[in-house]
Amino acid sequence: MEKQSLTFDGDEEAKIDRKSSKYHPSIWGDYFIQNSSLTHAKESTQRMIKRVEELKVQVKSMFKDTSDLLQLMNLINSIQMLGLDYHFENEIDEALRLIYEVDDKSYGLYETSLRFQLLRQHGYHVSADIFNKFKDDNGSFISSLNGDAKGLLSLYNVSYLGTHGETILDEAKSFTKPQLVSLMSELEQSLAAQVSLFLELPLCRRNKILLARKYILIYQEDAMRNNVILELAKLNFNLLQSLYQEELKKISIWWNDLAFAKSLSFTRDRVVEGYYWVLTIYFEPQHSRARVICSKVFAFLSIMDDIYDNYGILEECTLLTEAIKRWNPQAIDGLPEYLKDYYLKLLKTFEEFEDELELNEKYRMLYLQDEVKALAISYLQEAKWGIERHVPSLDEHLHNSLISSGSSTVICASFVGMGEVATKEVFDWLSSFPKVVEACCVIGRLLNDIRSHELEQGRDHTASTVESYMKEHDTNVDVACEKLREIVEKAWKDLNNESLNPTKVPRLMIERIVNLSKSNEEIYKYNDTYTNSDTTMKDNISLVLVESCDYFNK
């Protein structure tokens, strides 16, 4: 017997107590579809590509011609911060092997910190004990370091690369920050700009494409800049930006065709912001297919979140969960009309992904389906908690909400469109919820809750981890947020540890997970800038996706 769809007449609908909040509309609209001035002319693009190849040859020669290891370290550091390192992976790997073997006992603070940073960033096991030489007999950092702004900044940045038990890096963090703040007014422009940038968010927690865009502006004012590298950075960024604009135009047209902004008007219309979030996971051109697939998945997940969290009643959410678990078009029986539309388009989009994948890649969609099913189940649990006014313990909350953070689903989606490196073994590893994925989920969940707490409680939202901690420890919101931030820092140490060689899966895959954690730090730095996107999110999107670099000023 066919199930009857869950429908309500006008009077019944009016009586339903929905939690719906008003989100501001898309601030971008059709900008990336209609603005023809965004992309460069074909002839201009070809000239830029030709010039980039010429400049790359010159930079590769720099690696060969540089015998001084400090100059080599500075070269690698500049290339990485300018977003050029994917062009020079072999040269950097070879240089790091030399740098690893060097005896750094005679190095000063800057050189020691830079060496440690570069090696840790690439998974080398280097001991933090090397920084003990900068301490006095009382265990304090020596006072002669206080005026060394460049060295202090480098030490400050590496202090965030620590793993559990490396207390000297925790001490370095506490020591360097006030010193750098006090020196700010005395520094030359380029160094002051770097200090300001990294005090806001340290180097190892910045997403690479936004860092590249911001660092270009700093580097061009540096008296010690290399003009070949600067020109390459600007041209390379503009070429990447053109690619991103093409991707976003296609995604925006796809989004408009789905028409969710009209049929599901209670949801956040954030397809541009979602694309930017995915872009921070992998900005390199070879990941174009993966970015587009992941961005489309992200758009569907954002809607799903709003259905469970902001609009659907418990009966509707239960029906949607059962339909998602079945993953079959026939499962729409019983769904209200607005959910039928969403559900069928979800299934159709996943079929399109499968068609796009190679024959030996199609199995990946089964893993992604399982992730979406787990996400729906976790959303339903939170919906039930909200109805019951249940405030779970922190452990009970995290057992469910690490999944509802969506981070593990986004990670899986980010792997689907990648190349041969994304093997079945990688997906099996991912589905086991390894430590590095758990840490990423902790960071995403807790940062979201810390920044969204006041807004969400003001609209009768399910208890967050902030409420769970407050109830369990009988404390106030400020203490709860401080303690949750400490848990975030522990999760970062887990991430740092899991990033050291040898990694359990190819390093490229670990980096996707770390990059998602970095983007969570940026997006939830001051508030939920995805939901409230007319903030720093808008500024950052403009920098990366709209404003090109003036590469004629070398």
Swiss-Prot record:
Keywords: Cytoplasm, Lyase, Magnesium, Manganese, Metal-binding, Plant defense. One of its GO terms (cellular component) is cytoplasm. It comes from the Eukaryota. It catalyses: (2E,6E)-farnesyl diphosphate + H2O = beta-eudesmol + diphosphate; (2E,6E)-farnesyl diphosphate + H2O = 10-epi-gamma-eudesmol + diphosphate; (2E,6E)-farnesyl diphosphate + H2O = alpha-eudesmol + diphosphate. A motif (DDXXD motif) lies at residues 305-309. One of its GO terms (molecular function) is terpene synthase activity. Mg(2+) 1 binds at residues 305, 309. InterPro entries: Isoprenoid_synthase_dom_sf, Terpene_cyclase-like_1_C, Terpene_cyclase_plant_C1, Terpene_synth_N, Terpene_synth_N_sf, Terpene_synthase-like, Terpene_synthase_metal-bd, Terpenoid_cyclase/PrenylTrfase. Pfam families: Terpene_synth, Terpene_synth_C. Mg(2+) 3 binds at residue 456. Belongs to the terpene synthase family. This is Beta-eudesmol synthase.
